């Protein structure tokens, strides 16, 4: 349980960060997809969990909100919190994550750190996106 005062302090900070403070009197039916996504993010962070499980967190967010979310997740990571993320936005995942599990057609095809994946695919300068594309081309052969 969270004390009401603590919850309101956390919510206030997050509403400010995601530029929703002036929208408190709006009904959610009038929110855009991005605004709804921001509300879900705020709800997840207000409880201050030790593990964040986030599925496609960037979907529907504008570039500023994506940067805010990345900053917020980075702050939580520095506090020792764990983050399990499912995403198709590999450039952002590469910047944020320590290790990766790459799925293709519902099967685990590769896992490890970016350094380990680069070695596994013999692509020393590859991005995560490059590795994924190589993996899917290999699978198509």
Where in the sequence are the language-model features?
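Helical segment within the ABC ATPase nucleotide-binding domain
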Residues: 67-79
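Conserved ABC ATPase "signature" region
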Residues: 3-23
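Conserved catalytic motifs of ABC-family nucleotide-binding domains
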Residues: 48
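ABC ATPase "signature
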Residues: 111-112
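Conserved ABC ATPase signature
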Residues: 27-31
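Catalytic Walker B motif of ABC-type/P-loop ATPase nucleotide-binding domains
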Residues: 52-56
């Amino acid at each position: 349980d969270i004390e009401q005062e603590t919850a309101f302090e956390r919510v206030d900070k997050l509403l400010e960060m995601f530029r929703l403070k002036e929208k408190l009197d709006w009904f959610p039916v009038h929110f855009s997809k991005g605004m709804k996504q921001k509300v879900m993010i705020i709800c997840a962070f207000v409880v201050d969990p030790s593990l964040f499980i986030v599925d496609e967190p960037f979907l529907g967010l504008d570039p500023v909100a994506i940067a805010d979310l990345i900053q917020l997740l980075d702050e939580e990571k520095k506090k020792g919190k764990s983050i399990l993320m499912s995403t198709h936005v590999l450039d952002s995942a590469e910047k944020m994550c320590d290790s990766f599990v790459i799925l293709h057609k519902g099967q685990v095809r590769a896992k490890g750190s970016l350094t380990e994946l680069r070695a596994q695919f013999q692509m020393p300068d590859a991005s995560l996106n490059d590795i994924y594309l190589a993996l899917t081309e290999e699978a198509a052969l």
